[in-house]
C-alpha cells in the first residue's frame, strides 16, 4: 500500500508549531512506511520521532506482535510524556497504523468501518489497527480544526482527492491545505499546522528498488 501525503504550517517569526513528515520504502522488508508528528514543543517532537525511528530499526514487531501488544507498548511510552504536553503522531507500515494524540493536537479523518466511511475526531487516544485504501488521516492543532473543520473534512474526503497520479494528488492536497490555512488565519487562527496522509492502492510512488525520504519541519 502506498501513501499520498501533504502538510501545512503557519510560517511565523518565532515558530510555535513543529511538524515532521517522512516517507520511505524498505526494500528488504518490502514495506511502504510513512510517519508524522506534530507538537508545539520542538524537543518533544524530536523525542517522538526518535521513538518511531527506534521502532523501525528494531525487530519487525509490526508483523510478529499483536495490535494490542503494540498499543500497550506505546501507551506505556506516552505515559512518560508530560501530561500538559500537546502532540499527535501517526506511523503507517503498509496497511497497519499506529495513531496517538494528546492535549491541543487532534487526530481526525475519514475511517472506513463496516463498509461505511465517516469523519471522526479523537482526543487523547493511542490506537493500533489496519487501514483500508481511502482512509484519510489528519494530524492538526485544535485551532486549525476549530476554524476550518467543515472545509478540512470536505477537501480530505477520499472521493474528493481524485484518481490521477499520486504526485499530482499530493500537490493538490498541499495547495488545498495552504488555502485553508490562509482562510483560518484571516478568521483569527494562530500557531497552526497539519499533516495529512491517505493510504491508497495502485501505482507506486517510487520506482522499483528506490528509497524515498522526505522531512518537513518548521525551523
Predicted ranges, named:
Residues 14-70:
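Primarily the active-site beta-strand->alpha-helix module of PP2C/PPM metal-dependent phosphatases
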Amino acid at each position: 500500500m502506498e501513501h499520498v501525503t501533504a502538510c501545512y504550517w503557519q510560517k511565523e517569526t518565532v515558530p510555535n508549531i513543529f511538524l515532521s513528515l517522512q516517507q520511505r520504502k524498505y526494500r528488504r522488508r518490502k514495506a511502504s512506511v510513512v510517519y508524522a508528528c506534530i507538537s508545539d514543543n520542538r524537543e518533544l517532537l524530536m523525542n517522538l520521532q526518535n521513538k518511531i525511528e527506534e521502532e523501525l530499526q528494531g525487530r519487525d514487531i509490526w508483523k510478529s506482535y499483536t495490535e494490542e501488544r503494540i498499543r500497550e507498548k506505546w501507551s506505556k511510552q506516552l505515559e512518560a510524556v508530560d501530561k500538559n504536553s500537546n502532540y499527535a503522531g501517526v506511523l503507517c507500515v503498509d496497511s497497519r497504523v499506529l495513531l496517538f494524540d494528546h492535549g491541543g493536537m487532534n487526530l481526525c479523518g475519514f475511517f472506513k468501518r463496516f463498509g461505511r466511511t465517516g469523519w471522526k475526531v479523537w482526543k487523547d487516544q493511542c490506537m493500533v489497527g489496519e487501514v483500508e485504501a481511502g482512509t484519510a488521516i489528519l494530524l492538526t492543532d485544535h485551532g486549525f480544526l476549530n476554524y476550518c473543520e467543515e472545509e478540512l473534512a470536505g477537501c480530505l474526503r477520499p472521493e474528493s482527492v481524485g484518481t490521477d497520479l499520486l504526485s499530482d494528488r499530493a500537490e493538490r492536497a498541499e495547495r488545498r491545505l495552504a488555502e485553508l490555512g490562509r482562510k483560518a488565519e484571516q478568521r483569527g487562527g494562530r500557531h497552526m499546522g497539519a499533516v495529512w496522509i491517505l493510504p491508497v492502492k495502485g501505482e507506486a510512488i517510487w520506482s522499483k528498488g528506490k528509497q524515498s525520504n522526505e522531512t518537513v519541519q518548521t525551523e
